[in-house]
Amino acid sequence: MYKRQANEDGDLLTKTRLTQIGRDLLESILGINQITIAAVHGASAGGGACIPTACDFRIGTENCIIGYPEVKLSMNLSWGALPLCYNLVGPAITKRMVIGGELEQAEDLFAWGFLDETVPADKLESRSTELAEFYASRPALAAQMIKRGVNALQMANAGIMHMDGDQNALATLSEEFQEARDAFLNRKK
């Protein structure tokens, strides 16, 4: 309720601080010393798609769908997720996913490099565990150093994304956002 109220009536400071919570979450995931693996079953959208984007590996079921539908609410992708998506799939697919705002199919996500693997739904937990055990069996210090190095390379340009929270807060003031939000909240359930 607090977040919805802030989006309706809150000032820019409140809105940017709320967006910072998501950025802090993704930075925390990136900063975990151990290897992180997202196991995606069903739909993963918006913030739910940003979380696996920040993980080291992503395994999805053959019928999972993932997307960033923020644009449909006249909002940009925030939380610092844009460079993470860009580094996974490149500029053209990032634009397709973020500007298009559609939920993408597992087959395409795998072909683009967003998903590392797809498995039948009944194999998701066992395959995720198998992969976790594999990486956990590697020398911890070396794995941690490699992960930190790769993340540093991956995020070399992320500093320019400081403004995504401000852009997001500003976008929520637009008439397009108000109309899209009202349509979303009033849709038939």
Mark where each language-model region is.
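Helix-loop "lid/cap" segments that line or gate small-molecule binding pockets
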Residues: 97, 109, 149, 153, ...
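A general structural signal for well-ordered alpha-helical segments in protein cores
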Residues: 22, 82, 91-94, 142-146, ...
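C-terminal long alpha-helix characteristic of the crotonase
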Residues: 59-64, 115-162
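CoA-thioester-processing core
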Residues: 24-31, 39, 45-98, 112, ...
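Well-ordered beta-strand positions
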Residues: 57, 96, 100-102, 108, ...
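Glycine- (often His-adjacent) and acidic-residue-rich active-site loop
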Residues: 1-27, 44, 74
